[in-house]
């Protein structure tokens, strides 16, 4: 950090800036590039036209990026705040950062954390999440010690401290992610709590949460902004799970004239929700909305939406629910919002927003409110007579989902909702190269928003660059793979590249732990067998294709060898195993691996079916954890 910047800045201010930098630096690579700035302005929900935002970003990059490497380092970020403070551009930038949900108040007032730095957090989010979690876990005997929480106090930040609530919420969002037998529920010593928090964090990572900046100690301390950030990711994954065509074919009712199913499938859950709300608003004769913030502040669109989706009592066993529209004409916005929420309550959907959240247009909480409405009352009918190719709706394979969750857990941006469609401009792939220490020259990369004309050309250039990096600096085997294949969304060839990225990422972790010694399959297999042997275990593996792996006994034994005594062998079946036995062993093995601190992305089925690629990642993660033994 150069002297000039440091002399004018206090330690508290510096910590604050670090906090802000981390929030803008979505992929946590230590630099901010222009697409991250675009995201910041998008999330801050500022009433600026697109061209204005582009202008501001260009100016920030021009003034801030002093060494002209196409990205802003932390030093340059500090410089923007110190030197460019007075300019309108910097003021707008600071406003965007302060408005971004859950960000520290730069030069504002907020709760002081233990280190004396400022972290603000959204009281509205806390209130909303507490009510949602209270409802979700009200009948769970394992949570009686903390549920119900008081939404008006700091109960939430204490309640997540032992990891149980987090594990339960993860399972509600993606059922069966965590084997309940692996959650420590009794005699909660600090060590046992640490294990639960490991289990929660590594499982959150496996379902696609970005947890790079969150440690178990942050959760134990109940750091508000980190707790809320993690909970929002977990809750959102659950809310969005069914807003996806392959899991909900009735969404095809939202097809527009001349639109193909393939085009509809490329929409993100947020875009589909907006399309869904507008479908019902159109049927009610009300005007379209463009967002879940400014356009819903007067609650009028919500009144019409509720009236459209409320059950009309026409199906068998379905009671009719009438929405009272009289509050629509209320003159006061807050009273109108309250009246609307009372109607939502009739549908059992008074969740996530208070009248004030509606009137202020809180984008995050309104999105959650609408997603919950969709999940309870989609009010869509699958189109029967149209010429639709339903075979497209196969849904993603396990392998595709694992790759997607791995990418999202690393904080790539934009978020990957659809593996092939969302990689077609290669931006995500280029960010993954950075994660595996392959330098990317961002000045060569075309970034959104792409021009209307020639957009695909810009994306194709990125794809060509991604393949070029794979062949040369990364030394991947990419025979027969060209940029066009990524741009076309060719599944086999895209997967081939993505697997090599994930494999390299996994091996890099091992090499970092092993003082730079190269790691490969043979080294991992021999380490596994040596470790099992030294611990007096009778299991061993020949390779990652070894059929005996399907019992998961070698994995379970290895976990017990790494952390002696952690496996409860009463829960492990051996001898002649049924498919159910194998599945239960695998489920326990994956959760226990995560509990002792291995970030395993694979699924129990990968072990049962002995999928060599995923099996390799499991053993590599365990080897990494084993090498960390102090």
Swiss-Prot record:
Residues 109-382 are annotated as: Actin-binding 1. Ca(2+) 2 binds at residues 65, 67, 69, 71, 76. Its main location: cytoplasm. Residues 12-47, 52-87 form the EF-hand domain. Actin-bundling protein. Pfam families: CH, EF-hand_7. GO terms for biological process: actin filament bundle assembly; actin filament network formation. It comes from Bos taurus (Bovine). It is found in: Cytoplasm. The gene is PLS3. Residues 383-627 are annotated as: Actin-binding 2. Residues 123-239, 267-378, 397-506, 518-627 form the Calponin-homology (CH) domain. This is Plastin-3. Ca(2+) 1 binds at residues 25, 27, 29, 36.
